[in-house]
């Protein structure tokens, strides 16, 4: 009886893992149409970015990992902005003051300034754009080629090996 229970649990775990792996596989070179508003009121669209290599760093100001991510985003922007790469930090926080996940434009600009981020801050307040890119955890980074296609899937979460910067640099260097 214990053996049957173990087999059932194991089978259930295998199905769960297979399901998770399926959802995690976002096709590379996928073009995603999107429109995001900056904290300065500009609208940035996928069409307006055509011809640019773009880094979209998704995060939230309340999330400690996003604060860590900002250090890497800042370094990435410093290193690649003069090489034709445009970097944006995309907040997933709501612009609705009634939301538990609320952050005003001013709060987001102050947050970016506090952490030395000198890139445009965009808003994905309903999470629709991050979902289109297959972002399933924060923080995550998506890289777009000059045609607006995703260069590989999203890169995100914890980086215990410290290899994230190398992965991003490798993807960007291939696109340049």
Which residues are covered by each model-predicted region?
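Short active-site neighborhood of thiol/selenol oxidoreductases, capturing the structured segment around
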Residues: 46-67
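Hydrophobic beta-strand anchors of alpha/beta hydrolase catalytic cores
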Residues: 55-56, 87, 141
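Structural micro-motif
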Residues: 116-120, 134-142
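Thiol-/selenol-based redox modules, centered on thioredoxin-like
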Residues: 143-176
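Bacterial N-terminal signal peptides that target proteins for export
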Residues: 2-13
């Amino acid at each position: 009886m214990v053996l049957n229970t173990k087999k059932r649990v194991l089978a259930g775990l295998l199905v769960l893992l297979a399901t998770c792996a399926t959802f995690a596989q976002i096709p590379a070179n996928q073009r995603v149409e999107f429109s995001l508003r900056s904290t300065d009121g500009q609208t940035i669209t996928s069409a307006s970015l055509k011809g640019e290599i773009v880094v979209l760093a998704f995060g939230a100001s309340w999330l400690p990992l996003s604060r860590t991510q900002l250090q890497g985003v800042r370094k990435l922007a410093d290193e690649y902005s003069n090489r034709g790469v445009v970097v944006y930090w995309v907040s997933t926080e709501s612009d609705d003051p009634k939301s538990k996940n609320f952050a005003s434009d001013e709060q987001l600009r102050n947050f970016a300034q506090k952490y030395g981020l000198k890139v445009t801050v965009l808003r994905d307040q309903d999470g629709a754009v991050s979902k289109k890119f297959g972002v399933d955890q924060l923080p995550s980074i998506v890289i777009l080629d000059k045609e607006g296609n995703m260069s590989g899937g999203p890169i995100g979460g914890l980086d215990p090996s410290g290899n994230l910067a190398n992965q991003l640099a490798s993807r960007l260097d291939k696109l340049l």
